[in-house]
Amino acid sequence: MSFNKNKYQVIRNAISKEVADIAYRYLQISAEADHWMLNNGMTHAGNRLVGNFNEPQVPNSYAKYGDRLMETLLVKTIDVMQKKTGLKLVPTYSYTRLYRKGNILRRHIDRPSCEISTTLNLGGDNWPIFIDPTGSDNVIDEYKNIHKPGAPKGIEVNLKPGDMLIYSGCELEHWREPFEGQLCGQVFLHYNHADGQFAKSNLYDKRPMLGIVK
């Protein structure tokens, strides 16, 4: 499978299973700690330094932008991605989620900071991601999950902990069907083309550096 040909590619063992497990356990602890602090008045829902339990794209999941461990993975994986795909990349941001039973990721495409997107499996129960390689526009209303009649069913991609799917996030629609497991940890690592129009203006998702919130 060639990224240049298909605009998506799977990299097996992009990180080791040991590193994936550390990140997954860290994500679980972060979710539990943030939930406890919110419920016990130690922080508030508007504090961007804690995770989000009410994120509109996937309600009832735990999500966090720019977590420093995940930003480390954002940088750490660039070399293997460039070697496997031939791409030249600059990092924009990371976004991690701990999914729970019944969660759904609706069909969508990404914003310009996600020219090259990845989903990296950290651990938990298997939950395939679907990607439409045709590049066609089928979403009428993402948040109401309304699509055009006859929208392609997409290709199912299954990832084990440490595996990564790379795809053209602004071009290829991607989604997940309702989650039937208990927990699944994923981190989305986003990049721009190093020689593209957003390389300088959008570096670090317009933040002064990695590891800070917007």
What is the meaning of each model-derived region?
Residues 1-85:
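Non-heme Fe(II)/2-oxoglutarate
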Residues 101-171, 183-186, 194-206:
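Catalytic core of non-heme Fe(II) oxygenases with the double-stranded beta-helix
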Residues 98:
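Conserved active-site beta-strand element of glycosyltransferases/polysaccharide synthases
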Residues 205-214:
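C-terminal helix/juxtamembrane-tail motif
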Residues 176-181:
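Short proline/glycine-enriched turn/loop segments at secondary-structure junctions
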Residues 10-12, 166, 190:
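Short, well-ordered beta-strand micro-motif
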Residues 86-95:
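A short coil-to-beta-strand element that immediately follows conserved catalytic motifs
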Residues 76-80, 95, 117:
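Generic beta-strand or strand-like secondary-structure segments
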